[in-house]
Amino acid sequence: MRMDYSLLQPHTVELYKLKEHNFSLKRVNARTLLVVQRFDLFAKLFYIDNINTNPSEAERVYADHIKAFNPDGREPGRDDKNGVDDFITSFDEIIKHFKDHDFDERISVVPVDRNGVILDGAHRVAALAYFNREVTIVQFNDVDAVCNFDYNYFKNRGLSWSICDTIALEMVKWVDGVYAACIWPSNNQNNQQIAVSELNEQYQVAYIKDIRCNLNSLSSFVGYIYRAQDWTRNSLSVRDKASRVYGKSNLRVAFFKAESNLDDVLKEKDEIRHLLGKGKDSLHITDNRPETLDIANAVLTASGMNQWLDSRNLNFCHKLYSTLNERWFVFKNVQWIALKVAVYRIVNRLFKKHVVL
């Protein structure tokens, strides 16, 4: 089988040395390429889904995720994208085209790595997935993506946490097999991290949300997520459960993608509970997609959080805590590193100048 490499972006071919690797061509539904390792796909899907009903929010989410990806507004290997407006114009054309047309493999194909993670073509894949169309992929079976463009990548690039929440909710809507683990505040931070590590060892942790809440708020949250169970009809039972899972730590909600069936997830839940030593008061994991969507809406949207966060004072405290925490994170992981790089370049330039003189 011969491959026409002109169907791929030259930059991608060169970056991965694709001409040196074995490949196979396949026709697949684009939705099979929606994986949590490509968090950006869900920002693009959010844009498509909201551009006509809430254009300002759609453009804000899309533009900010592009800036996190490409701070200079340029796409490597492309001369036609010299700013966010060019990205939007190009994407609008792609959306318009695939709304009415199938993917034409005579024009292009989408490269993917051995695990089915796309190496290029995110805009095409997002549009095709939205309209439930097929795409021709060329899979390189001994190539791995050079970077994991998951939620951590975008947080570490300074994308605001509120926009990350919006994208994460979109991800939960589109990807099957996503569960939510509520790791209760009764666990100290070390044990909470142990729980996340255990989940990540077996599955792929797709997003983490930490929420600072008091006992009243946690009681409301407990009553909400367990509301289908009879015991929640008694407010004292709800309060008792909340008291047992309350502690000094944040409520940590970890969304993870599981390829295995529910029985395996339940087994993993029991193992983590045993490891943390608090039984059912260690963590809660959803059993199905509706439950996961329910929790996602409760913790990833402002309207959802306002339903259970203590309205008397916690909203302000939570916002202040979240703002300070986010700004410190951005300074430590983005601005401080950028400053060190800038200083290094200046010192290096001065050193070279001194050597020449």
Per-region residue spans from a language model:
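Catalytic micro-motifs at enzyme active sites that drive phosphoryl/nucleotidyl and oxygen chemistry
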Residues: I107-V109, R124-V125, K241-A242
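A sequence-level detector for short glycine-anchored, His/Arg-bearing signature motifs
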Residues: D113-F131
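Short alpha-helix boundary/capping and kink motifs at helix termini
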Residues: E57-L119
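Short glycine-/small-residue-rich flexible loop motifs, especially phosphate/cofactor-binding loops
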Residues: I95, V125, V196-S197
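Non-catalytic terminal and connector segments of soluble metabolic enzymes
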Residues: S162-V347
